[in-house]
């Protein structure tokens, strides 16, 4: 799968137009438009979209009526599902 024509966030902390080549559930390559490889296979047009790395929420108490302090495993599951839905891959309760 290739996501092309998308703005990717670079290590230089800038967005550049380019694409992402996926190999299963792994990122194989991120490229700038000027260095785009020949696109074969499934190509998704990312026009108008931005791609950023997964985020880490360093200070989080809860959401949607659930709180870590409740100590409820089901609530923690709902919190984790919500965070994943908005691009957060890791979170810490302090």
In which residue ranges do the predicted regions lie?
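Short acidic/polar active-site loop segments enriched in Thr and Asp
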Residues: 88-90
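N-terminal metal-binding scaffold of metallo-dependent hydrolase/deaminase domains
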Residues: 1-37
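Conserved small/polar residues in nucleotide/adenosyl-binding loops
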Residues: 93-94
């Amino acid at each position: 799968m290739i996501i092309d024509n998308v703005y990717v966030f670079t290590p230089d902390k800038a967005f550049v137009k380019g694409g992402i080549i996926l190999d299963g559930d792994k990122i194989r390559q991120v490229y700038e438009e000027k260095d785009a490889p020949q696109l074969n296979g499934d190509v998704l047009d990312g026009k108008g979209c931005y791609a950023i790395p997964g985020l880490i929420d360093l200070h989080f108490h809860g959401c949607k009526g659930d709180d870590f302090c409740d100590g409820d495993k089901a609530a923690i599951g709902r919190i984790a599902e919500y965070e994943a839905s908005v691009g957060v891959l890791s979170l810490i309760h302090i």
